[in-house]
């Protein structure tokens, strides 16, 4: 069904930049909300559709927009970063003042801009029955017929997204799902290159590279646990923060180092459930780069042939939902043994690291002092005023006295 704007009342105009055209005003129209639906090609919404096991997709395929929109609206509200505060504020604003900012849709009913406003209007219609909430004010654009036209719509969506407060309640996983579809998913007709994305989104290349690294790490981890591209799993298991930390550690390693050490890092993150999990995984990641005591101790457990052999089964057990009390007890007991083993390895490595720091502490301090002294050039000292030279000589004498006492302490122990 194609929306014919000649049948509907005109609204405000909205400034848009589409493709290579100059920014200009586009006329908006009041379109019935029952003819509109959330854009299933949007990365964030595609994640929700993946999550629900096909119910939303089934509704969309048979044209049941109302039920489809109910499902997606529920996901949008549930995943907001601010516990729904922005949604409530927008809803109250529209209730008292009406919709003041037009959205953007395609002529097949897909919403390109205005998801929150559309959701609020739908709720207000159900709650009040007021006819004024039967319409969504929006610019209506032609649906793309070519890959180039599809990319122009995607660039418009990005441009609006990064200049619109409505999008700031996106959680990080939803944003990165969109980023993946926009920049890494070559199967998508909307996939665009780095330069084009940065220009449309107003983002610096360094930020693009950081997002790319995090997305690649998430995809790699999902592949590792046997759930390729299942972004919804990351949300369910609250893995947004830990995988950001892991991606940050990956940035400091060569590809060869990363390939060698990622199994230990992924395994520890997946099965460790003891203590301060965030602090501990950060310690393992940091230590991995230096081949330190913590990493080596954890790695020794994970690279043990028995652990490696049981890893696929352990991943299945962790992911499987128990259906009986016996299965629950068995699963809990199995995972607890793994957690205890990893926890003991972490504690052992931490103690070894502390002992090493204690042993090497004095030497590290002296190394630091020596480096600082090397930065004082003799020529600088020769050119100082007489008074300054005398002060420095006194300082040197005090330092020599302190060093002599430390040297004597070492000599006494060695005697």
Please place each PLM-identified region on the residue numbering.
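Residue-level detector of alpha-helical secondary structure
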Residues: 243, 247, 262, 312, ...
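Charged/polar low-complexity intrinsically disordered segments, enriched in acidic residues
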Residues: 313-396
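Short, charged/polar connector segments at secondary-structure boundaries
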Residues: 1-132
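Amphipathic alpha-helical "recognition" segments
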Residues: 129-136, 202-287
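An acidic, glycine-rich, mixed-charge low-complexity segment common to nucleic-acid enzymes
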Residues: 1-14, 27, 208, 373-376, ...
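Amphipathic, charge-rich alpha-helical segments that serve as recognition/docking helices
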Residues: 78-79, 126, 132-225
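Short active-site loop/helix that positions an aromatic residue
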Residues: 116-131, 279-296, 303-305
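C-terminal intrinsically disordered extensions
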Residues: 190-240, 288-339
